[in-house]
């Protein structure tokens, strides 16, 4: 076997290995609920990780005890802390995925044939460096594309956190109203039973009737 064939075979094997490692790496950084790279990941008691917003927003009744989405083990939903290392790795993976997307032929600047690295905050569009300094965009605000992407995810996280807080508040209000209605219903049942008992109790004899004469009773007794 020639040296060229051996080298080619080794290169293909290396590419396949890298591809396999990349897929495993990507899978480990993907939330099993939203199937995207983690946003503010939290690791629960059983060891599995989820995006914090995904974890919170998938419980309608907001129980204290619940089950893991993957292993179905009962877990505590308290004091969830961000997995900092996993968050950083997911952020790097998002940036790498973004650069892979921007480097594709479809996303190259049609005028200058350069990668669109800049984001125009006015036009909300991706531009290459030359386009961002052109007359049309010169006075617009620009930032690197990865900054814009991370800012987008942070805003999304805040919105989802706000939704979760509102859901918690609504659930608390609902619990208060449910308890109040239950108490009023119990009070109404007590009143109903009390009224029923009073209606079936024997009524006392009217003293005025018992003290008065019964007309004709003596005459009837004398007939015997």
Curated annotation (Swiss-Prot):
One of its GO terms (biological process) is innate immune response. Its EC number is 2.3.2.27. It catalyses: S-ubiquitinyl-[E2 ubiquitin-conjugating enzyme]-L-cysteine + [acceptor protein]-L-lysine = [E2 ubiquitin-conjugating enzyme]-L-cysteine + N(6)-ubiquitinyl-[acceptor protein]-L-lysine. SUPFAM superfamilies: B-box zinc-binding domain, RING/U-box. It is found in: Cytoplasm, Cytosol. GO terms for cellular component: cytoplasm; cytosol. Its main location: cytoplasm. Keywords: Cytoplasm, Metal-binding, Transferase, Ubl conjugation pathway, Zinc, Zinc-finger. The keyword DNA-binding does not apply. One of its GO terms (molecular function) is zinc ion binding. A zinc finger (B box-type) spans 104-145. Zn(2+) binds at residues 109, 112, 131, 137. A zinc finger (RING-type) spans 31-72. Belongs to the TRIM/RBCC family. E3 ubiquitin-protein ligase which promotes K48-linked polyubiquitination of protein methyltransferase PRMT1, leading to PRMT1 degradation. This suppresses methylation of the PRMT1 substrate MAP3K5/ASK1, promoting its activation and increasing MAP3K5-dependent cell death induced by oxidative stress. TRIM48-mediated ubiquitination of PRMT1 also suppresses methylation of FOXO1 by PRMT1, leading to inhibition of FOXO1 transcriptional activity. This is E3 ubiquitin-protein ligase TRIM48. It comes from Homo sapiens (Human).
